[in-house]
Swiss-Prot record:
Natural source organism: Rhodopseudomonas palustris (strain ATCC BAA-98 / CGA009)
Function as written in the Swiss-Prot or TrEMBL entry: Involved in the gluconeogenesis. Catalyzes the conversion of oxaloacetate (OAA) to phosphoenolpyruvate (PEP) through direct phosphoryl transfer between the nucleoside triphosphate and OAA.
Record's subcellular location: Cytoplasm
Pathway of action: Carbohydrate biosynthesis; gluconeogenesis
Keywords: ATP-binding, Cytoplasm, Decarboxylase, Gluconeogenesis, Lyase, Manganese, Metal-binding, Nucleotide-binding
Positions with a binding annotation for Mn(2+): 201, 220, 257
Example GO biological process: gluconeogenesis
Protein name: Phosphoenolpyruvate carboxykinase (ATP)
Family: Belongs to the phosphoenolpyruvate carboxykinase (ATP) family.
């Protein structure tokens, strides 16, 4: 077997059970991985120097194909209401079949850290079949120094083989595509998909399992810090603006997607960003655009011009979920330490396509826990067929697919941390105003940024608030530079009766969704629920 690159020779592929490999490329950097990806026909080059790959059938994660070993370790610690199980025997069969499938291959290996805090990070080794996958995970996780590589002993091992096909009968899975995690052995197996996001989210899921035991709240959020050291956390589901809003030229970016919050403050799990890039423009998101159009960026499913090879970020013909992965260093004001102090503000982002939520509201700690457990946004389906009814999406803790433990574990930790550190909490609607999707319009990003700036710099503490009659939270009545009518959503609707009907409908959706959590929270959190009785009749 031919091995090239730097690694711990005393802890090689044999420790994982890999054998009869043709070769291993250890800890290659971007130039070498570009060369292999292009030579192997895995990807093409954009005119700006980005590596552009097509993920084939899977253009997003496949949560229905994700499984966890149910054994003595996980039986009483996993949230089985939100996770699918396989037996230890089925996982072992899958593991052995992965090892067999890898024989004769040349693999790419990366030794990386999941987590910027040395106390809580997890040493992660990732074997990939594809060179561009190796570059992706090297970009997304945190890269050790060369001296650290020579003594690196992994705690978590992940193997990613897109050409592998699972056997549902033999392996206990649903299809030929599989993501399987064994927490006891700290092994992740990914097969049948080229969508690179499965790798990063598997590491995230692992951290979500282990960190609560160590007093750290793992979060699906972005984070930044102001010039005075004031840290802000942004929760939100895909498409709500986590990445866009945390990339603020006046604040230092900690990270765009995954963080831990513990006794010493906030730390990034990653060393890169993974931004949605449909409709990406230099005008609206200059930093992300610049990071996505340069050497070292990895673009997924982005269409290139046939002759000029320029990325067409407006073209969603392959998928609306086009992605750009780039190192944090590509953002001019990013923190390279990935660490910051205790948060002063927590922001929960919701893209409300019903158009009835205010652009910003202040939450009590109990309301914050309620909305954290709810994890609301709304999706708009079938855009190309005209106006359709928005679909509410409730993803608990703003990351249901990545939660191994019961949501109340994370919810209670958040509430305790908010109270302990006297954190201000805000709900921000980045969705629609002036009507439901189809009649209203998207909340202007300039308005959202102005409101966020006022919240983060403390200006909103000194304004007058009203109580929203449907949702019960506090809403500012006026703010310099922001049209006052946009702060009260009913005033933006021409049909006030339709607003009332729509708002009541959304309140009912919140109540129906939260019913499953009511037994796990106290009376104060239950009382924080939206209630149509509050609304003016």
């Amino acid at each position: 077997m031919q091995e090239t690159g730097v690694h711990n020779g005393a802890y090689g592929t044999d420790k994982f059970g890999l054998k009869n490999l043709k070769g291993v490329y250890w800890n290659f950097g971007a130039p070498q991985l570009y060369e292999h990806a292009l030579k192997n026909g895995e990807a093409v080059l954009s005119s700006d120097g980005a590596l552009v790959a097509d993920t084939g059938v899977f253009t997003g994660r496949s949560p229905k194909d994700k499984f966890t070993v149910r054994d003595a370790t996980t039986e009483n610690t996993m949230w089985w209401g939100g996770n699918q199980s396989i037996t230890a025997e089925q996982f072992e069969a899958l593991y052995q079949d992965f090892l067999k499938h890898a024989e004769g291959m040349t693999l790419f290996a990366q030794d990386l850290y999941g987590g910027a805090d040395p106390t809580f990070r997890i040493k992660t080794r990732v074997y990939t079949e594809l060179a561009w996958h190796s570059l992706f995970i090297r970009t997304l996780l945190r890269r050790p120094e060369r001296a650290e590589l020579e003594n690196f002993v992994p705690e978590l091992t992940l193997i990613d083989l897109p050409s592998f096909r699972a056997d549902p009968k033999r392996h206990g899975c649903r299809s030929e595509n599989v993501v399987a995690i064994d927490f006891a052995r700290k092994i992740v197996l990914i097969g049948g998909t080229q969508y690179a996001g499965e790798m990063k989210k598997s590491v995230f899921t692992t951290l979500n399992y282990y960190l609560p035991e160590k007093g750290v709240l793992p979060m699906h959020c972005s984070a930044n810090v102001g010039p005075n050291g004031d840290t802000a956390i942004f929760f939100g589901l895909s498409g709500t603006g986590k990445t866009t809003l945390s990339a603020d030229p006046n604040r230092t970016l900690i990270g765009d997607d995954e963080h831990g919050w513990g006794k010493d403050g906030v730390f990034n799990f990653e060393g890169g960003c993974y931004a949605k890039c449909i409709k990406l423009s230099s005008e609206n998101e200059p930093e992300i655009y610049a990071a996505s159009t340069r050497f070292g960026a990895v673009l997924e499913n982005v269409v290139l011009g046939e002759l000029d090879r320029k990325p067409d970020f407006d073209d969603g013909s392959k998928t609306e979920n086009t992605r750009s992965a780039y190192p944090l260093e590509s953002i001019p004001n990013a923190s390279l330490t990935g660490r910051a102090g205790q948060p002063k503000n927590v922001v929960m982002l919701a893209a409300d396509a019903f158009g009835v939520m205010p652009p910003i509201a202040k939450l009590t700690p109990a309301q914050a826990m309620y909305h954290f457990l709810s994890g609301y946004t709304a999706k708009v389906a079938g855009t190309e067929r005209g106006v359709t009814e928005p679909t509410p999406e409730f993803s608990t803790c703003f990351g249901s697919p990545f939660l191994p433990r019961d949501p109340s574990v994370y919810g209670n930790m958040l509430r305790e941390l908010i109270a302990k550190h006297n954190v201000d909490c805000w709900l921000v609607n980045t969705g629609w105003t002036g009507g439901i999707y189809g009649t209203g319009h998207r909340m202007p990003i300039k308005v959202t940024r102005a409101l966020l700036t006022a919240a983060l710099d403390g200006s909103l503490r000194n304004v007058e608030f009203r109580t929203d009659p449907y949702f019960g939270f506090a809403v500012p009545t006026a703010l310099p530079g922001v049209p006052s009518e946009i702060l009260d959503p009913v005033k933006t609707w021409a049909d006030k009766a339709a607003f009332d009907t729509t708002a009541r409908k959304l309140v009912g959706m919140f109540q129906k969704n939260f019913a499953k959590f009511e037994a796990q929270v106290d009376a104060e959190v239950r009382a924080a629920a939206p209630d149509v009785k509050m609304a003016v009749e």
